[in-house]
């Protein structure tokens, strides 16, 4: 049965450092025999929706492929591992998604899943009804 690794970094405003830390975790997962590594929602940047009044965070959105996905494609290809990431995608001017690209072990983008919006920061930690 294939091994699945779950990976999470302590993301900061330093996007290149975030990518490097993620790639190190991917290399470690591959070395331990994982065939697939999965990152959480908004796994490569601080969870910025809590600062929704600050428009500068839209500058962090990137296309697929873009800087983060291209970096992940290289490490996937080098280590023969499948990666499911999650980034803030800019699909077109004014069109943004919380997107999960799937990168194959050969480095190709196999597909992506897009959410229509990022969770509202004020309700994402609300008490449940039970």
Language-model segment annotations:
Residues 10-13, 43-46, 91, 117-119:
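Feature marks short, surface-exposed loop/turn motifs that line or immediately flank catalytic pockets
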Residues 1-13, 38, 99, 112:
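Active-site-proximal beta-strand elements of phosphoester/diester hydrolases
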Residues 16-21, 65-66:
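Glycine-rich anion/phosphate-binding loops
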Residues 4-7, 18, 26-56, 76, ...:
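Active-site beta-strand/loop signature of hydrolases that rely on acidic residues for catalysis
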Residues 68-83, 87:
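A structural motif corresponding to the C-terminal end of an alpha-helix
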Residues 57-70:
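A short acidic, glycine-rich active-site loop
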Residues 64, 74, 90-130:
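Active-site catalytic loop in hydrolytic enzyme cores
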Residues 41-42, 86-89, 113:
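Short, well-ordered beta-to-alpha junction loops that form the rim of enzyme active sites
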């Amino acid at each position: 049965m294939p091994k699945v690794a779950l990976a999470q970094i302590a993301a900061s405003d330093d996007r290149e450092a975030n990518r490097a830390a993620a790639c190190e975790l991917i290399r470690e997962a591959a070395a331990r025999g994982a065939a697939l590594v999965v990152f959480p929602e908004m796994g490569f940047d601080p969870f910025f929706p809590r600062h929704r009044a600050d428009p500068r965070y839209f500058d962090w959105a990137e296309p697929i492929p873009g800087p983060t996905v291209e970096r992940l494609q290289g490490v996937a290809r080098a280590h023969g591992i499948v990666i499911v990431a999650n980034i803030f995608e800019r699909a077109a001017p004014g069109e943004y998604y919380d997107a999960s690209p799937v990168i194959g072990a050969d480095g190709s983008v196999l597909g992506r899943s897009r959410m229509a919006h990022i969770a509202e920061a004020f309700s994402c930690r609300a008490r449940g009804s039970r």
